[in-house]
Amino acid sequence: MKKMSILSAAIFGLMMSAPVAFADDITVSVVGPMTGQLATIGDQFKQGAQAAADAINAAGGVNGSMIKLDIEDDQCDPKQAVSVANRIIANGVKFIDGHACSGSSIPASAVYAEAGALMMSPASSNPVLTDAAAKSGWPTIMRLYTRDDAQGAFIGPWIAKKYAGKNVVILHDKSAYGQGVADAVRATMNTGGLKEVYYDAINPGEKDYSALVTKLKDLKADVVYFGGYHPEAGLILRQSAEQNLKFQLIMPDSIASPEFWQVAGPAG
């Protein structure tokens, strides 16, 4: 219901303030990783958007117009995201529910801003998205998700306090999202008085992280904070268990997918 009211209000506001012509339906492009290893996130996007559209339409639509969804796949790839954004604008769509990954949202936002389209990202947390929009004077670029620096302000000090004296490792997957949130947590954890014993990036999509697991064993890691997504997190945890290594894994809510448990197995 919250998403329904935000979407409805945003569309209504842009309708009243901008010279946008509408037919019987209002098209909203829902953009995310509909295929690929992060497709579960895209599926969540689709289901959430459909529930919101159904509720809005059942209540009479927006100013009498019905919501129609256009599902687009960017696979969380920045280049594909820009291509998708250009296609959406070429098709005359003015309302975008997406993108998911910060690395996709940031470059795509420039395309939407130039066209005066409303972009609301439900999942992109890198501060650059809205900071760049504010600096450039793009009022139609928005996020519905907590920024990395806000997440770091909470998680970093908590780790510093709870795991004082422990061996903490911070990893990320090189993405705008993963590195952004990992760096935010690292900075506030350090300010809180705890220094990590190891900080590094992994290569996402790999099937064998045994070298990393060996490194974690050598470091006697007690805690691993991972800025990234569930496929790699589950695999690292499973392969660690196979080498009899146990540690406390801490992640943002990108871990919240049934696939994490499928990949991690009993180690999860």
Residue locations for each model-derived region?
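Extracytoplasmic ligand/sensor domains, especially the bilobed periplasmic-binding protein
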Residues: 93-198, 248-267
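Non-catalytic positions within long, well-ordered alpha-helices that form the structural scaffold/packing
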Residues: 82, 89, 160-161, 217, ...
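Hydrophobic alpha-helical
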Residues: 102-113, 207, 214, 221-243
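Sec/Tat signal peptide C-region and signal peptidase I cleavage site
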Residues: 18-23
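Bacterial N-terminal signal peptides that target proteins for export
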Residues: 1-8
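A local structural motif
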Residues: 63-73, 92, 193-201, 219-223, ...
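Beta-alpha junction/loop-to-helix N-cap segments that form part of ligand/metal-binding clefts
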Residues: 25, 40-47, 55, 59-132, ...
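Short beta-strand segments enriched in small/hydrophobic residues
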Residues: 25-42, 99, 167-171
